[in-house]
């Protein structure tokens, strides 16, 4: 038997009052997801353990089958693994994300954590300017994906975890800036980056075109470095991972998985859902277990655009769920687990720790199905798992 694990980030949400207390997933037309739910065992899972904040660093690790309580590390260390950046003992990796800030009274407000979906090529131009003007043997910059890059500094580990920018839309940043002597150099580097970016020809051209400038970096993602136990030894199955997410790629490589790097136009994460589906189905010919991760809807959710989220979910249904349903209907040697890693709420513009729905296709005789794939699965008395690792173990051991 082959095992396909599909993680759809950003699908579920909280009920929205102005939408008759429906969620975007309930509003969207999703015939293929609903058909899957009707033919599957449906249940829910708590991917975020107690005492952990919701985020990809926790939920994706959980759905790889590794307990965050034991194996949690920072986003930046996994990004460094993904980018093959060597780290010395005294190196501290940090996520270095280009953002757009907006002046507001005596503060700056986070306007866009993707810097207007900054393409990788343009991000590289700005990153090169930072490396040239403030880089030295103790401060190094490495290009990543789109606005998301990596900075490595010579420093002891920080005592506090830095705030990620994804949940700060509309927030004044002053309250989230790190304080204390250990962060003085970090704040200095952020301030220097703003000066360099303000004077960069790229931003002058954006100003002339009436566009918001890419006027700051946001430094975050510090945490412990982790080497994960090999997936093949943990579950006695070979595995591949299809993703355009740096952190998930880093986790997969740390776990000894074969990582298929799917890129789209201009070096951005692939806009073509179909390319990811085709890659995952191809990997099933070689590997026992294949992970397929679709992350595009998450950023739309965190920007708070409900209508765009509904449209993105409908695209997901047509270009991910539909082709997968058609492909698996023609095979009897593949089981699929479809699950979300955590709630990315468009109404709150935040991650939440809410339980998320899952389905296992095809269902065994007598399994609990559902009329549609939405949040009602979470509220029903269907199969529940207390953690992601418990769900993954049960799925891979044919207990579902």
Language model feature labels by segment:
Residues 1-400:
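Feature captures the catalytic ectodomains and active-site-proximal regions of enzymes
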């Amino acid at each position: 038997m082959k095992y396909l694990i599909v993680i759809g980030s950003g699908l579920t949400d909280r009920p929205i009052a102005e939408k008759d207390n429906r969620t975007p997933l309930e509003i969207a037309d999703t015939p293929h997801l609903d058909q899957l739910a009707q033919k599957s065992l449906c249940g829910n899972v708590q991917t975020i353990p107690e005492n952990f904040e919701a985020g990809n660093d926790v939920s994706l690790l959980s759905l790889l089958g590794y307990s965050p309580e034991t194996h949690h590390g920072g986003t930046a260390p996994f990004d460094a693994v993904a980018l093959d950046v060597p780290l010395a003992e005294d190196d501290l990796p940090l996520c270095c994300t280009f953002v757009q800030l907006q002046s507001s009274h005596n503060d700056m407000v986070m306007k866009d954590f993707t810097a207007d979906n900054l393409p990788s090529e343009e991000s590289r131009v700005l990153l090169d300017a930072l490396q040239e003007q403030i880089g030295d043997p103790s401060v190094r910059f490495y290009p990543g994906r789109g606005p998301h890059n990596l900075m490595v500094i010579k420093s002891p580990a920080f005592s506090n975890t830095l705030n990620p920018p994804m949940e700060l839309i509309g927030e004044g940043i002053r309250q989230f800036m790190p304080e204390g002597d250990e962060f003085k150099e970090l704040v200095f580097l952020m301030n220097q980056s703003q000066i360099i970016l303000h004077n960069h020809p790229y931003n002058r051209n954006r100003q002339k075109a009436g566009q918001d400038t890419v006027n700051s970096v946001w430094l975050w993602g510090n945490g412990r470095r982790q080497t994960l136990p090999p997936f093949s030894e943990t579950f006695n199955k070979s595995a591949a991972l299809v993703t355009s997410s740096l952190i998930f790629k880093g986790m997969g490589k740390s776990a000894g998985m074969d990582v298929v790097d799917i890129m789209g136009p201009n070096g951005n994460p692939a806009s073509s859902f179909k390319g990811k589906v085709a890659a995952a189905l191809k990997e099933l010919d070689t590997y026992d277990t294949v992970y397929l991760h679709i992350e595009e809807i998450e950023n739309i959710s965190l920007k708070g655009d409900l209508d765009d989220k509904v449209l993105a979910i409908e695209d997901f249904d047509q270009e991910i769920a539909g082709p997968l349903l058609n492909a698996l209907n023609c095979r009897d040697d593949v089981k699929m687990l479809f699950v979300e890693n955590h709630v990315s709420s468009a109404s709150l513009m935040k991650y939440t720790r809410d339980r998320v729905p899952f389905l296992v296709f095809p269902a065994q005789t007598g399994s609990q199905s559902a009329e549609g794939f939405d949040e009602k699965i979470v509220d029903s008395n269907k199969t529940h798992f207390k953690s992601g690792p418990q769900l993954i173990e049960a799925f891979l051991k044919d207990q579902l």
